Amino acid sequence: MRQSLVVLCIVVAVAGACSGDPPDKEMQQAQSAIETARAGGAERFATTELKGAEEALAHARDAVGQRDYRLALSFALDARERAQSATKEAIDRKATLREEAERSLGSAQTALLAARNRLKAAEVSKVQARILAESRSNIAAGEGRVQEARTAFEQGNFEAASAAASQAATALAQTARDLDALVAPAARRRR
């Protein structure tokens, strides 16, 4: 009799611990936070945090299936927190990439203007047109890369914008140096 009373107390205690409602509200909040993180670019910029949030929400659902609502609540709250962290991380990363792309575009634009100015100086110095043809071609290609970078920037693809702008800046700077080398001997010959 005593043993059955102890078993009955344990069963009542376990049933009492498992009673209550599943944390539906918290799980919905976690799901909403995950969707917000995805919309904010977390799949691309904060993959680790987003994956952690999705896994925590899956664990919460599993715990609800096992009627362990306390554990489900804990996982749901963790999922929501991780999703919010993923959103913030994605926003920060995008802002950093945007700033880098803006700097790269500025450098490319400066290099383009410098190359154009060097070309004009070479023309004024009466450097032969056939010699300048390659420089004109390089400047046109650089303009195309700068335009590609601007297009990528406008589409929000800041990594591609930075890459295209950096390539353009490097190539245009080399063209400007090449033109300087052509102008210097021509200037010495006139003296």
Model-predicted segments: where are they?
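Long, charged/polar, soluble alpha-helical segments
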Residues: 18-191
